[in-house]
């Protein structure tokens, strides 16, 4: 249950520079990595298989295959560590959670593209 006071406070804190992100989108998440006193940007590109939360607590799970090994990472969308997010492809899906993609490999892991992202 969300109170009106909580929504009022969150409205000022929430990021508005991010695009709409849903399950089935292929995204590039640009993450700030701090190593010692240096900071760099690392890109994590993959498929959004789940999203949870609302408002300031919204987060997404992004999955990619790296050298034959599946890698999943959870991102809080309002984190200051996220520089920006690009939507690279919009796929047609009929589920809210795409956990079945974990078991699929090769051609069976393809999704039908709806349209190119801008």
From Swiss-Prot:
Task performed by this protein: This protein is located at the 30S-50S ribosomal subunit interface and may play a role in the structure and function of the aminoacyl-tRNA binding site.
GO cellular component labels: cytosolic large ribosomal subunit
The entry's keywords: Ribonucleoprotein, Ribosomal protein
Family assignment from sequence similarity: Belongs to the bacterial ribosomal protein bL19 family.
Annotated protein name in UniProt: Large ribosomal subunit protein bL19
Molecular function via GO: structural constituent of ribosome
Keyword Ribonucleoprotein annotated: yes
Lineage per the UniProt record: Bacteria, Bacillati, Mycoplasmatota, Mycoplasmoidales, Metamycoplasmataceae
Organism of this sequence: Metamycoplasma arthritidis (strain 158L3-1)
């Amino acid at each position: 249950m969300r109170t009106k006071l909580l929504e009022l406070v969150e409205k000022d804190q929430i990021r508005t520079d991010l695009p709409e992100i849903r399950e089935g989108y292929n995204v590039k998440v640009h993450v700030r990595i701090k190593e010692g006193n240096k900071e760099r940007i690392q890109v994590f590109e993959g498929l959004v298989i789940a999203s949870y939360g609302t408002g300031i607590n919204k987060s997404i799970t992004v999955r990619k295959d790296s050298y034959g090994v599946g890698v999943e990472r959870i991102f809080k969308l309002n984190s200051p560590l996220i520089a920006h997010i690009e939507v690279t492809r919009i796929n047609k899906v009929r589920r809210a959670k795409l956990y079945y993609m974990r078991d699929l490999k090769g051609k069976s892991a393809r999704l039908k593209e709806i349209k190119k992202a801008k």
